[in-house]
């Protein structure tokens, strides 16, 4: 699974696991999705 955010390099599974803390899959995916939403909000705020 690769996730790409505008203008950022793709994140590998290992990097994603670090970001979401590598907890249980469902929890990690939920937290990952939440984190991505927050990041996208920040990017909008910064005009990216």
From Swiss-Prot:
Proregion residues are 1-25
Keywords associated with the record: Antibiotic, Antimicrobial, Bacteriocin
Role of this protein: This heat stable bacteriocin inhibits the growth of closely related Lactobacillus species. It may act as a pore-forming protein, creating a channel in the cell membrane through a 'barrel stave' mechanism.
The encoding gene: plnA
Indicate whether S-adenosyl-L-methionine appears among the record's keywords: no
How it assembles, according to the record, is: Active plantaricin A is composed of an alpha chain and a beta chain.
UniProt name for this protein: Bacteriocin plantaricin-A
* GO BP terms, alphabetized: defense response to bacterium; killing of cells of another organism
Q: What domain of life is recorded for the organism? A: Bacteria
Q: Does the keyword rRNA processing apply?
A: no
Miscellaneous note, as given in the UniProt record, is: The beta chain sequence is shown.
């Amino acid at each position: 699974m690769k996730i790409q955010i505008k203008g950022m390099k793709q994140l590998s599974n290992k990097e994603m696991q670090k970001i979401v803390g590598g907890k249980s899959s469902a929890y990690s995916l939920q937290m990952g999705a939440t984190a991505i939403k927050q990041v996208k909000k920040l990017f909008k705020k910064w005009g990216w």
